[in-house]
Amino acid sequence: MTDLLKRLAAAPGVYRGRGDGLESGPFVARIKVTSVVRGNAITLDYEAVSDSKGLQHVEHTILTASEAGRLELHVTCLELPGVTRFVQSEPGVFNAYEGALPAKIIVTMPSDGVLTYGWWWSRDDAEPREQSRAEVRRTG
């Protein structure tokens, strides 16, 4: 269950690419991946910018394993109050532990130096659906 943590710890750097979202439309994404505490945690600093909307998403996330060994994302961003914990339910799929709206984040590394980061949510009790997704490549 910690494969993603190990892969990201071995591939720190700045990732840049493009994304798209139902509300945001097309955007340019930048995610800085930093290994901390000897690879026991990863920080992800994510920004999304577009010409029409400017800076539209700022997020600071910590990926780490819980005491039980399950991966967790601890997310703070402009759209959420405080810090929200997302717990991995299957490889790369993190469900919100608590919150007003059903939500999840899907993080994958389909190949070396490539990272995808998707936000899924629903404004009602329906199953979350993909709302925003970035595909970025390591550039530095």
Feature locations, PLM:
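Tryptophan-anchored aromatic micro-motifs
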Residues: 9-23
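Short beta-strand segments that buttress and anchor functional surface loops
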Residues: 16-20, 44-50, 73-76, 93-99, ...
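N-terminal leader/targeting helix
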Residues: 19-52
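Short, surface-exposed coil-to-beta transition loops
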Residues: 26-30, 55-60, 80-83, 100-104, ...
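A short, structured loop/turn motif at beta-sheet edges
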Residues: 34-40, 64-70, 87-91, 108-113, ...
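Helix-adjacent hinge/juxtasegments
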Residues: 49-85
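Short aromatic loop motif centered on NTY/YTY
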Residues: 80-116, 122
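Edge beta-strand at a domain terminus
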Residues: 121-140
